Amino acid sequence: MTVTDPIADMLVRIKNASMRRHPTVDVPYSKMKEKILEILLREGYIARYEVIGEIPQKYIRVYLKYKGKTPVIQDVKRVSKPGRRYYVNKEEIPRVLGGLGIAILSTSKGIMTDKEARLLGVGGELICMVW
């Protein structure tokens, strides 16, 4: 099956698995997905992840995080899509739930959170928002 938006596919897999209280979820590997997962790990939205296998069957196992029985990731929203890219400059970077969530951007300085982008004074493609 061909996936037209691999990033959205990963985010939805993580969201669905956490809503069903699964301990892990597997997603096909890509460098961009790994960078996004690094941010989610650093910000405390997932417990950990590991890259498993060799190309072409390489995948990432994501270990989900819960507070009691409540998933840490409440929702995710894919903003920039393959058919409709969404770019923001440094002044337009949104604050997710008044700072309780994060926005992930792809900038000229790499993939980073909204806070890091504001600190560096760069804008870019708004990939997704997580809360």
From Swiss-Prot:
Choose any GO biological process term that the UniProt entry carries and state it: translation
Looking at the UniProt record for this protein, which Gene Ontology cellular component terms does it annotate, in alphabetical order? ribonucleoprotein complex; ribosome
Keyword Ribonucleoprotein applies: yes
Say yes or no: keyword Mitochondrion present.
Answer: no
Which cysteine pairs are joined by S-S bonds? none
- Please report a single Pfam family linked to this protein: Ribosomal_S8
User: Which keywords does this chain's UniProt record carry?
Assistant: Ribonucleoprotein, Ribosomal protein, RNA-binding, rRNA-binding
InterPro entries, per the entry: Ribosomal_uS8, Ribosomal_uS8_CS, Ribosomal_uS8_sf
> Annotated Gene Ontology MF terms?
rRNA binding; structural constituent of ribosome
The annotated subunit structure for this chain is: Part of the 30S ribosomal subunit. Contacts proteins S5 and S12.
Give the UniProt family note. Answer: Belongs to the universal ribosomal protein uS8 family.
What is its biological role? One of the primary rRNA binding proteins, it binds directly to 16S rRNA central domain where it helps coordinate assembly of the platform of the 30S subunit.
Q: What is this protein called?
A: Small ribosomal subunit protein uS8
Organism of origin is Dictyoglomus thermophilum (strain ATCC 35947 / DSM 3960 / H-6-12)
**What gene name is listed for this protein?**
rpsH
